[in-house]
Amino acid sequence: MNIENKEITSSWFTNLRDLLCKEFEKIEEEYAQTKGLKPAKFVRSSWQRNGGGGGVMSLMKGAVFEKVGVNISTVFGKISPEFRNEIPGVELDGKFFATGISLVAHLKSPLIPAMHFNTRYIETSKSWFGGGGDLTPFYPEKNETVKFHAAFKEACDKYDSSYYPKFKKQCDEYFYLKHRKEPRGVGGIFYDYLNNGNFEQDFAFTQDVGKALLSVYPEIVRSKLFLPWTAEQKEYQLIRRGRYVEFNLLYDRGTKFGLMTDGNVEAILMSLPPEVKFN
């Protein structure tokens, strides 16, 4: 396994975590100042994995972000034999290394979309990058959806014109609730097992995906920061959040990978919304 690759990827995910947390705290401050509130801050807690490695959870519950979590982790060791068929390159000895960042934002306002983002680097006897970002509005708006997709398309097009249509399609297919026959949101991009034989290029692309998210999502949040909403709209948001829960518990690869590798349960389930209704 390549030690330098491990270090620079892990360092980037930590840096991106800091940039995202800083920007989200800034949004909370902007809102709090106009409402006479004390701005919320992220609370961090670290955890260690028994088999090797660990991570840091950053969680904020505020007036804008009802719950936003930004997790980073770097874990390594051996995967249990019963799970070795599910991850490429661990079939023989089970050894793995994984580092990444995961972000989920649930907003108080039903007019502001929820958002999920993650990027990761994994080494077994093979190595690859994966990740992406997707938007889940409760009241979709075309301009907003176009803006979100355009940010990721720009990042993709720097590297390969085939990336965006391919990764968009993969996102649409991945974030689909088969049992309900409906998409979870308005999509974005999703990629996995990315290894073009050029680590530097694949890593640069993964960094640009993170930068795209950092540029577009805060802009979307700010555009609706002070819009009024009704109790009926909030009720609808809580019901639709149920779809989020269903997907994460039934289909999400990150949830499954975390549980298979004996990750921190609180960090793995951080993506779940703080309040939800099932009718």
UniProtKB/Swiss-Prot annotation:
Keywords assigned by UniProt, alphabetized: Cytoplasm, Heme biosynthesis, Metal-binding, Oxidoreductase, Porphyrin biosynthesis
Region called Important for dimerization, residue ranges: 244-279
Binding site for a divalent metal cation: 106, 116, 149, 179
Active-site residues, Swiss-Prot/TrEMBL: 116
Transmembrane residue ranges: none
One of the record's GO molecular function terms: protein homodimerization activity
Associated pathway: Porphyrin-containing compound metabolism; protoporphyrin-IX biosynthesis; protoporphyrinogen-IX from coproporphyrinogen-III (O2 route): step 1/1
Cellular component terms per the entry's GO annotation: cytoplasm
Catalytic reactions of this protein: coproporphyrinogen III + O2 + 2 H(+) = protoporphyrinogen IX + 2 CO2 + 2 H2O
Binding site for substrate: 102, 118-120
The family this protein is said to belong to: Belongs to the aerobic coproporphyrinogen-III oxidase family.
Descriptive protein name: Oxygen-dependent coproporphyrinogen-III oxidase
Gene (UniProt): hemF
